[in-house]
Structures are given as C-alpha cells and as structure tokens.
Amino acid sequence: MKRFAFKMKLKPGFEREYEKRHSELWPELRKQISDSGVKNYSIFWDKDTNILFGYQEVEGDANSQDVEAADEITRKWWDYMSDIMDVNPDNSPVTIPLMEVFHLD
C-alpha cells in the first residue's frame, strides 16, 4: 500500500461549503475513488492558512490522482469545486505533493 500526502488551497470563507460538498460526495465519484485503489482518504483543513492537507493510501502502482485525472466524473467534480479552491487551467485543484519524512505502524 502506498501513502500519498498533498496540500491544496481553499479560498477564504468557503470552509463550510467545502465540507458540505464533501459530505454530499456523489456516489459515482465515491465509487471511482475506491475503484482507483484508494482505500483510505482524509482531508484536513488548517483554519489559519486555508491549506487543505490530503492523505491517501492506495493499492497498486498507480498514483490515484493520475488515474482520477482521466475520469469524466472527476473532471465534473473539479468543475464543481473550482469556485472555492485554487485551481489549474483545467479546473483540477492546485495540488502540491508532500514528502513523507516519518512513518510508524
């Protein structure tokens, strides 16, 4: 199982909307994430900086973000979220990978 961590940026004032949209995650997106090998996925919010910290555990060799980028459902989700996050020209969230420096099982 591979572990991935990354950070994203939430626009100020949208923390409740971000949480609401994720609490209503589309069933087809939930399935797509699971089918791409993600077995554990959490997102945390730093209220002082509006930085979102994502953590995933992924089975197999694929980086789940690469798999998701090719998926139409994911692209629709990106469009849906683009008004409340920093995004790239294709509306994917600006995602900065983080390097693991310690792990303890």
What are these regions (language model features)?
Residues 1-3, 49:
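A general secondary-structure signal for short beta-strands and their flanking turns/coil
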Residues 4-9:
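Active-site-flanking beta-strand signature of metal-NTP-handling nucleotidyl enzymes
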Residues 10-12, 60:
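Beta-strand elements of well-folded, non-transmembrane domains
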Residues 14-39:
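Short amphipathic alpha-helical segments
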Residues 30-53, 57-59:
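Short, glycine- and small/hydrophobic-rich beta-strand elements in well-ordered beta-sheets
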Residues 36, 58-96:
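An amphipathic, aromatic/His-enriched active-site/gating alpha helix that lines ligand/cofactor pockets
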Residues 103-105:
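A hydrophobic membrane-anchoring alpha-helix module
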